[in-house]
């Protein structure tokens, strides 16, 4: 029987082959509004929930090569009263790939094999919030909708013709898009009508309601915001102490 780790590795490659690497290629002319995410890097419970979501839904596909399990665990508060990393908890809940908590967060399938078999390897997401912005990422995560014309049966409101399945559909459910017609002008100034997405509405339920799912995606973005710049967390902590000292 194929192991869970191997299955995760295959899923990761499938996502990249069918276009998830489009994070680097996504269209820049976005007409759907970008939502504002209100994450808090000082909220360790949120960071821990986000880490759990990432490891269960994303880590089989995308590495976080600049972060080590033990360093991450210490930063987000998975430690005992003496500040020592709870390695057993990390191994049971977050580390499904490596044998050591001191290892960086990598995918199950080696990059060389992915490149040899498919010509491309899954993109690392360590810096996704810095390159795309956390608001863009949050909006992307909550904006999948049903589209029978697409290979995976879904599309994305801010990433038209997305090539990956909706990996979080079991949590969110499936949305449908309603459209509106607007008048725009072409490069010659000639007006024409164009259909764009007006809003997304939940068509079938998932394990979470909309409020719960949006909160979960805030946690996931919060975790990736931390990953993109781990020292930001320490600067925020120091900033609080400096302010208290000056008062």
Describe the predicted segments one by one.
Residues 2-41, 226-231, 247:
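Post-cleavage N-terminal segment of exported redox proteins
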Residues 28-52, 63-74, 228-236:
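Electrostatic cytochrome c docking/interface patches
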Residues 45, 49, 53, 132, ...:
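Extracytoplasmic/secreted proteins, especially bacterial periplasmic and envelope-associated proteins
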Residues 54, 140-147, 223-227:
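Bilobed periplasmic-binding protein/Venus flytrap-like ligand-binding cleft at the lobe interface
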Residues 54-65, 220:
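The canonical Cys-X-X-Cys-His
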Residues 77-157, 162-186, 194-213:
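Electron-transfer interface patches adjacent to heme c in soluble/periplasmic c-type cytochromes
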Residues 204-242:
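Short, aromatic-rich amphipathic segments at membrane interfaces
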């Amino acid at each position: 029987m194929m192991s869970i780790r191997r299955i995760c590795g295959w899923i990761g490659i499938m996502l990249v082959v069918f276009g998830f690497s489009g994070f680097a290629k996504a269209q820049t002319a976005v007409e759907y509004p970008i939502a504002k995410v209100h994450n808090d890097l000082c909220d360790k419970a949120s960071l821990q929930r986000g880490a759990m979501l990432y490891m269960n839904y994303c880590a089989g596909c995308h590495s976080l090569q600049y972060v080590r399990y033990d360093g991450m665990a210490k930063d987000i508060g998975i430690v005992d009263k003496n500040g020592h990393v709870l390695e057993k908890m990390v191994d049971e809940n977050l580390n499904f790939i490596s044998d050591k908590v001191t290892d960086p967060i990598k995918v199950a399938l080696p990059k060389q094999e992915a490149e040899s078999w498919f010509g491309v390897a899954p993109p690392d997401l360590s810096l996704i919030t810095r390159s795309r912005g956390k608001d863009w990422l949050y909006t992307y995560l909550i904006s999948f909708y049903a589209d029978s014309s697409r290979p995976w049966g879904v599309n994305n409101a801010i990433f038209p013709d997305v090539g990956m399945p909706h990996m979080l559909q079991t949590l969110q459910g499936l949305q449908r898009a309603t459209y509106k017609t607007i008048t725009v002008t072409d490069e010659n100034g000639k007006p024409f009508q164009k259909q764009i997405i007006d809003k997304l509405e939940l068509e079938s339920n998932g394990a979470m309601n909309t409020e719960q799912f949006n909160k979960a995606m805030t946690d996931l973005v919060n975790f990736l915001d931390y990953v993109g710049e781990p020292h930001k967390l320490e600067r925020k902590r120091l900033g609080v102490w400096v302010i208290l000292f000056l008062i």
